[in-house]
């Protein structure tokens, strides 16, 4: 039986039931299609795992005596709270909790499988009222409970085999909390240009909002919302012109890693690369020359990436760096075949053979590299979000090798210096800096921060 919280007695019963029990929370938002930054919280379905109690804590639903959402901060637990889509829930709740999808993904490389949890009532309701807003507030609460019960059962399948670790706790904090911070900032747009380029009207107070999917097979986040793929915005068709600064005295600023993967790999295998152009360094070894032509420099880039992603043959394995990479790939594959899993470098996330398909040594290495890239960047984003608190500028977009900022010119040159040092780790991972009045045709300004 589900208890719907309607008065103080019910509310105290909920709080006492949660005190020492792990629990599963499934928030339901008023509108099924709005970005969570522009949405409201209809109610929360709460399940206490120790005592198997079910609650509905309502805030806007028409079937219930709704509670003041400010009371949500009173609901805490000494047990672990697992929230469905915690990143979205961060707008409403700042208490300690963990992401239920991340828990499932940590074990299987997939988020909770909820494709079949919609009830017939949900499907019919969404067809009838697809042009209306906030329909979850008036879809019958009994139908919501039916759906939440299905969701809880899927969660419990993953919970039954999950082991909480310090690494998971840290990954949850770094990944969920930091990407929540980026999503909250949004991207300011020229409304006319944006609507023209994307045929979308998802603009709220002059901004559009991204949503990062953290549950990909390798861990590298994808980034889509409202039909727009923000991780792969076209550089040629002018669509990037629609992204502009929100500040009266502002511009967009992009910091882009230089030869990022090569340096990450060097760090993984413990190889010291010189503090020079990576492609020039390798090109001189490829072509046995002291001076590279422009054509040889471009060829050097292609050769390096072909070797790292396609496999290293015997001739190139004679170059010390690539010989070490080849040994690392071989050792990684042997461990994978022997134990049936490997762990990522920093957060020790397991990657099990049963969940990785058609694997081979180079593909496994690429999985490990992309996981390592993401874990490195989580530390970087966390450091950036801490550093940026004292400035007016905002971090507004992340891709695997670059960060985009809405730069307030009042922050001055010191912001650029602090930012460059934070992202590059004081030069360990060199970055290039570009700036512009919009996200299209940005100019290199790296030398101005030297």
Functional labels for PLM-detected ranges:
Residues 99, 173, 193, 299-301, ...:
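Short Gly/Ser/Thr- and Asp/Glu-enriched loop/turn motifs at secondary-structure junctions
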Residues 94-97, 395, 431-433:
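Generic structural signal for residues in well-ordered beta-strands
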Residues 311-318, 325-370, 406, 410-450:
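C-terminal polymerase-core module
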Residues 2-3, 26-67, 191-294, 345-388, ...:
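Acidic, glycine-rich two-metal-ion catalytic cores of nucleic acid-processing enzymes
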Residues 2-13, 19-162, 259:
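Conserved DEDDh/DEDDy metal-dependent 3′-5′ exonuclease domain
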Residues 77-89, 256, 314, 397, ...:
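Short glycine-rich phosphate-binding loop at a beta-alpha junction
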Residues 90-166, 175-185, 226-361:
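Helical catalytic core of nucleic-acid polymerases
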């Amino acid at each position: 039986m589900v208890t719907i919280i309607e008065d103080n007695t019910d509310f105290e019963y909920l709080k006492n039931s949660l005190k020492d029990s792990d629990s599963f929370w499934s928030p339901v938002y008023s509108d099924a299609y709005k970005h969570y930054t522009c949405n409201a919280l209809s109610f929360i379905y709460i399940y206490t795992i120790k005592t198997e109690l079910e609650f509905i804590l309502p805030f806007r639903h028409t079937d219930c005596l709704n509670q003041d959402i400010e009371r949500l901060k009173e609901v805490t637990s000494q047990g672990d709270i697992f929230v469905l889509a915690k990143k979205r829930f961060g707008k409403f709740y700042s208490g300690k909790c963990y992401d239920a999808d991340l828990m499932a993904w940590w074990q299987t490389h997939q988020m909770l499988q909820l494709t079949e949890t919609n009830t017939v009532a949900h499907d019919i309701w969404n067809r009838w009222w697809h042009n209306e807003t906030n329909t979850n507030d008036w879809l019958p609460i009994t139908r919501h409970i039916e759906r939440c019960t299905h969701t809880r059962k899927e969660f419990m399948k993953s919970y039954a085999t999950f082991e909480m670790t310090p690494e998971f706790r840290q990954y949850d904090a770094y990944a969920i909390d930091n990407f929540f911070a980026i999503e909250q900032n949004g991207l300011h747009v020229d409304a006319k240009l944006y609507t023209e380029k994307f045929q979308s009207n998802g603009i709220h107070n002059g901004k559009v909002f991204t949503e990062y999917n953290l549950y990909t097979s390798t861990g590298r986040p994808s980034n889509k919302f409202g039909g727009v793929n923000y991780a792969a915005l076209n550089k040629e068709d002018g669509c990037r012109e629609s992204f502009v600064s929100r500040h009266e005295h502002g511009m967009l600023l992009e910091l882009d890693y230089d030869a990022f993967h090569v340096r990450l790999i060097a760090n993984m295998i413990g190889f010291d690369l010189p503090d020079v152009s990576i492609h020039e360094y390798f090109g001189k070894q490829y072509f046995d020359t002291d001076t590279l032509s422009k054509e040889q420099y471009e060829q050097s880039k292609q050769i390096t990436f072909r070797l790292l992603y396609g496999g290293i043959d015997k001739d190139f394995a004679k170059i010390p760096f690539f010989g070490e990479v080849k040994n690392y790939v071989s050792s990684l594959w042997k461990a994978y075949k022997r134990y049936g899993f490997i762990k990522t470098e920093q957060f020790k996330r397991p990657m099990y053979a049963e969940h990785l398909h058609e694997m081979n040594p180079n593909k496994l290495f690429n999985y490990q590299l992309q996981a390592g890239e993401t874990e490195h960047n989580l530390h970087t984003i966390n450091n950036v979000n801490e550093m940026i608190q004292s400035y007016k500028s905002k971090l507004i977009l992340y891709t695997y090798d670059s960060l985009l900022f809405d730069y307030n010119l009042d922050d001055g040159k010191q912001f650029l210096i602090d930012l460059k040092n934070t992202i590059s780790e004081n030069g360990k991972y060199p970055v290039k800096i570009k700036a512009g009045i919009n996200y299209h045709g940005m100019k290199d300004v790296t030398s101005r921060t030297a």
